[in-house]
């Protein structure tokens, strides 16, 4: 579930952003953006010239110079506004998280067990290793691990999901988050962080982005923009002696206007906003990224490691068929399978009971009246079953049943081996049923591939992204499901060590790898992956190892994370293309206006037939400022994203933003020139 989205121009955010835009006019803030710092200096210089002209200290048109100066200041303000609005949206999201933090007291236990004596202490004084007791109605005071008890927990304040979740000691569901509420029962929790280091604190810090560091691509683009600015600065500086030598020196105001229009102010003014908005969009998808670097890396990912269960398949395997061994009828197999599953509360176990009922009208027996001994499944035995009336019935994995049969002096039939292979090749999971040492047959558990997932993988393939399915199934089952789902490769019988080795192998080939995980055993692979999305329902170790946390705990979200990362990179690239190409139109507007008096031949470049030199220069400066405002929605929302190959995406962006950047300024400058002329302002 996603959080409520803020309107693009929320009135309160706009007002706050306008205030922040004015505050950012100080030199220290401007220095962080070299391109806009040049505009700021130009604004200051033309302001001083305007004052000097107005006072008579300098010759020239004070009104024209003041108009240029005013619009240069507006250009700086608009760039500040874009950044402030993006930051304001992030801070608004952070404020909603701050509302979760409440000043509360915690019951700190003197001993790590339920019922021990407790001291009431402020929650913000809890340290790592402290043990606390929380009961129904309490707010969990710290991040930690459940060491005793089990409870229903409302995590909606963090995740936005209203459905409660179960948290209990042991396993992968022992991690709890400070700020969530206990709905029932009780938990004894060991705090895993010190004050100020909780998941909620880190979320707020990341979302606010007060100390947002530039990403590598952002730094590289900034260097390019600085280089272009220096080139245009030197080129503009050389124009004054040329015009002076021609007998009609161009004014400093016009040269400043020319410089500002030629340097890439559009992308320079929107660059920070694009980065902040990328992290904000990620939060809109209920994913917390540790940094802009993580969001950017998501856009460069070219290998996705996807867990089969829950990501590629629905995750609830259902019994689909009873396949009896030679000499055994299907009803006998179904009866034994149902008996072995009566106490099995897993979805698979319940589906076996239901299938036997549907196929042979074998009604579900009353467990209490059977006077039977039920054998639960364990990781060691990998079997479960029932002992009843001198009958010992078991169901389990092929290897486990084979060992059981041989241990009881029996022989595993070759025809059952063939049936097991047949089930696995069809993409189902085989469970074998045995009574005593006699193998009765095979149950096929079918895991349903999610609808539309094959098409999504085809889109990823077009984008040059390789998909790899990770599963604990045997190779035959894994190969069948991989073929049905349309993934490029698979890792069967996966272990944490195998996943880690696979990630390192791809990285050694120069690829960027993304994966999801939720358990402590996933932590090494998460730490190694370039993009590691930890599930919020997972362990603390997994969340600390990842560089993103999915608050919805939805493994499929990894594909959306990649889309958001690519959208941010595309937005930056598209607006850079637009910014650089629209300099061409400004060149045709300002160069003839500024130098035609000295070099009449340049009148041939006045293809827009602008009214006068003053209106041409002022129109270009006004357009240069206004285009930043018009592009703010695109910077915040991101460009329209379509899954295409890199070459197709490049062609599309060049046509839309390259050609658009070339044509829009011609139209915009001409319209502004007409308006200025009609209104008699030039």
UniProtKB/Swiss-Prot annotation:
Quaternary structure note: The system is composed of three essential subunits: KdpA, KdpB and KdpC.
Name of this chain's protein: Potassium-transporting ATPase ATP-binding subunit
Positions contributing to ATP binding: 344, 348, 377-384, 395
Subcellular location: Cell inner membrane
HAMAP family xrefs: KdpB (MF_00285)
Disulfide-linked positions: none
Membrane-traversing stretches: 34-54, 62-82, 219-239, 254-274, 588-608, 616-636, 656-676
Ligand binding (Mg(2+)): 518, 522
Membership in a protein family: Belongs to the cation transport ATPase (P-type) (TC 3.A.3) family. Type IA subfamily.
Organism in which the protein naturally occurs: Shigella boydii serotype 4 (strain Sb227)
SUPFAM superfamilies recorded: Calcium ATPase, transduction domain A, Calcium ATPase, transmembrane domain M, HAD-like, Metal cation-transporting ATPase, ATP-binding domain N
Alphabetized UniProt keyword annotations: ATP-binding, Cell inner membrane, Cell membrane, Ion transport, Magnesium, Membrane, Metal-binding, Nucleotide-binding, Phosphoprotein, Potassium, Potassium transport, Translocase, Transmembrane, Transmembrane helix, Transport
Function field: Part of the high-affinity ATP-driven potassium transport (or Kdp) system, which catalyzes the hydrolysis of ATP coupled with the electrogenic transport of potassium into the cytoplasm. This subunit is responsible for energy coupling to the transport system and for the release of the potassium ions to the cytoplasm.
Catalytic center residues: 307 (4-aspartylphosphate intermediate)
Membrane-related topology note: Multi-pass membrane protein
């Amino acid at each position: 579930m996603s959080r409520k989205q803020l309107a693009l121009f929320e009135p309160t955010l706009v007002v706050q952003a306008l205030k922040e835009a004015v505050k950012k006019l100080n030199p220290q803030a401007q220095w962080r953006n070299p391109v806009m710092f040049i505009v700021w200096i130009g604004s200051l210089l033309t302001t001083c010239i305007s004052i000097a002209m107005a006072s008579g200290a300098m010759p020239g048109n004070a009104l024209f110079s003041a108009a240029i100066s005013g619009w240069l200041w507006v250009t700086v303000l608009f760039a500040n506004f874009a950044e402030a609005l993006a930051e304001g949206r992030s801070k608004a999201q952070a404020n909603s998280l701050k509302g979760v933090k409440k000043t509360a007291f915690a019951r700190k236990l003197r001993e790590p067990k339920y019922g021990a004596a407790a001291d009431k202490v402020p929650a913000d004084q809890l340290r790592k290793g402290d043990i606390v007791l929380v009961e129904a109605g309490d707010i969990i005071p710290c991040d930690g691990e459940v060491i005793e008890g089990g409870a229903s927990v409302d995590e909606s304040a963090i995740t936005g999901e209203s459905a409660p979740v179960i948290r209990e000691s042991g396993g992968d569901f022992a991690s709890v988050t400070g700020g969530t509420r206990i709905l029932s029962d009780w938990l004894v929790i060991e705090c895993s962080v010190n004050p100020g280091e909780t998941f909620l604190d880190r979320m707020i810090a990341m979302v606010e982005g007060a100390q947002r560091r530039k990403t590598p691509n952002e730094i590289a683009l900034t260097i390019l923009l600085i280089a272009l600015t220096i080139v245009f600065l030197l080129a503009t500086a050389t124009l004054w002696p040329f015009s002076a030598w021609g007998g009609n020196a161009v004014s400093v105001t016009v040269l400043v206007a020319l410089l500002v229009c030629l340097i890439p102010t559009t992308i320079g003014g929107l660059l920070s906003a694009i980065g902040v908005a990328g992290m904000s969009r990620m939060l809109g998808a209920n994913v917390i990224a540790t940094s802009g670097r993580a969001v950017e890396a998501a856009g460069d990912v070219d290998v996705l490691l996807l867990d089969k269960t829950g990501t590629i398949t629905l995750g609830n395997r259902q019994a689909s068929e009873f396949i009896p061994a030679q000499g055994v009828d299907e009803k006998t197999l179904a009866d034994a399978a149902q008996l072995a599953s009566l106490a099995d509360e897993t979805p698979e176990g319940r589906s076996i009971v239901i299938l036997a009922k549907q196929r042979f009208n074998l009604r579900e027996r009353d467990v209490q009246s059977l006077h039977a001994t039920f054998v639960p499944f364990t990781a060691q035995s990998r079997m479960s079953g029932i002992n009843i009336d001198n009958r010992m019935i078991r169901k389990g994995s092929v290897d486990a049943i084979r060992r059981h049969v041989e241990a009881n002096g029996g022989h595993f039939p070759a025809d059952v081996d063939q049936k097991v292979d047949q089930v696995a090749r069809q993409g189902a999971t085989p469970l074998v049923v045995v009574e005593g040492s006699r193998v009765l047959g095979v149950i096929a558990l079918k895991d349903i591939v999610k609808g539309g997932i094959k098409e999504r993988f085809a889109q990823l393939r077009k984008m040059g992204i390789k998909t790899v399915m990770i599963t604990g199934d045997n190779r035959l089952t894994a190969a069948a499901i991989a073929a049905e789902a349309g993934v490029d490769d698979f890792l069967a019988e996966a272990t944490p060590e195998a996943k880690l080795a696979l990630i390192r192998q791809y990285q050694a080939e120069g690829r960027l790898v993304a994966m999801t995980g939720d358990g402590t055993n996933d932590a090494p692979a998460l730490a190694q992956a370039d993009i590691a999305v930890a599930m919020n329902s997972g362990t603390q170790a997994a969340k600390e190892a990842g560089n993103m946390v999915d608050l919805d705990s939805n493994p499929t979200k990894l594909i959306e994370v990649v889309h958001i990362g690519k959208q941010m990179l595309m937005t930056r690239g598209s607006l850079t293309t637009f910014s650089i190409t629209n300099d061409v139109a400004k060149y045709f507007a300002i160069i003839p206006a500024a130098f035609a008096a000295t070099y009449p031949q340049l009148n041939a470049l006045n293809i827009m037939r602008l009214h006068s030199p003053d209106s041409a220069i002022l129109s270009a400066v006004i357009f240069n400022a206004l285009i930043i405002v018009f592009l703010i929605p695109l910077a915040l929302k991101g460009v329209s994203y379509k899954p295409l190959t890199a070459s197709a995406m490049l062609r599309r962006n060049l046509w839309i933003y390259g050609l658009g950047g070339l044509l829009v300024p011609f139209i915009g400058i001409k319209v502004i020139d007409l308006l200025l002329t009609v209104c008699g302002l030039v």
